[in-house]
Amino acid sequence: MALVASVRVPARVLLRAGARLPGAALGRTERAAGGGDGARRFGSQRVLVEPDAGAGVAVMKFKNPPVNSLSLEFLTELVISLEKLENDKSFRGVILTSDRPGVFSAGLDLTEMCGRSPAHYAGYWKAVQELWLRLYQSNLVLVSAINGACPAGGCLVALTCDYRILADNPRYCIGLNETQLGIIAPFWLKDTLENTIGHRAAERALQLGLLFPPAEALQVGIVDQVVPEEQVQSTALSAIAQWMAIPDHARQLTKAMMRKATASRLVTQRDADVQNFVSFISKDSIQKSLQMYLERLKEEKG
């Protein structure tokens, strides 16, 4: 049960599970261009946060080249960045977007799931679970400004948000295309998609591994707005202002009430979900399929 993309993902050597993450500490700061109230950028190797404390909003930019694949390091840095914003009471909303041209996130990093130990697979899947839970249950207003392709694990990130805005570019598709690679989305992501677009539409999308171009994405309801590419960020700022106009306590309690059942299903089954993932991804047939896919990507790149 993995969330991977059909876009090109580099086959690169990554740190082992539990290894020290270079650049994971979020101690570097610099003054943000145009940031109000003396705001300063902070970030890590793969995540840049541009805060505007005066407005109560931060923009979190993904910058894990070349395609923002969700490696173990990137997952960790995303959670740390979100936690830092949640602990700062001056921030009430976050816009999630990409610093990489043409791609929001290509999904989970296949090299984390191929040729590794069961312990590594378990650690990686726990990190995926943690990111989803932290985003899905966040008290902050989360708006995704989708300025690039958003398949598989990228769609996971977008679906956790309160509001989704997609750039009107036919190359920027969004959806959960796992079945096209012979794998499936986990139950908790299935639930999230079903909550968003309804049972029948989700059933069709998941079985066929559909990726929706902008017009279809808006029609099915997987995104809330489609706007010209140059207007994505400004539209996100306008949208987040609308959400932040609601008193926090009322909005947060309502959000928690609406999402509690879906989140609780994973919280109560986290260990079993990890075991199922490790068992599935360790199968010889799945490993061979992933290895063939990675080799094909190498050949295309070369």
Curated annotation (Swiss-Prot):
Subcellular localization, as worded in the UniProt entry: Mitochondrion matrix
EC number: 5.3.3.8
Tissue expression from the record: Expressed in liver (at protein level).
Gene3D superfamilies: 2-enoyl-CoA Hydratase, Chain A, domain 1, 6.10.250.170
Positions contributing to substrate binding: A106, G107, L108, D109, L110, G153, N177
Keyword Mitochondrion: yes
GO molecular function: delta(3)-delta(2)-enoyl-CoA isomerase activity; intramolecular oxidoreductase activity, transposing C=C bonds
Family as reported in the entry's similarity comment: Belongs to the enoyl-CoA hydratase/isomerase family.
Official protein name in the record: Enoyl-CoA delta isomerase 1, mitochondrial
Alphabetical keyword list: Acetylation, Fatty acid metabolism, Isomerase, Lipid metabolism, Mitochondrion, Transit peptide
Residue numbers of N6-succinyllysine PTMs: K61, K84, K283, K288
GO biological process: fatty acid beta-oxidation
Transit peptide: 1-41
Organism (species): Homo sapiens
InterPro entries from the UniProt entry: ClpP/crotonase-like_dom_sf, Enoyl-CoA_hyd/isom_CS, Enoyl-CoA_hydra/iso
Subunit structure: Homotrimer.
Main localization, broad class: mitochondrion
Residue numbers of N6-acetyllysine PTMs: K61, K89, K283
Site (Important for catalytic activity): E178
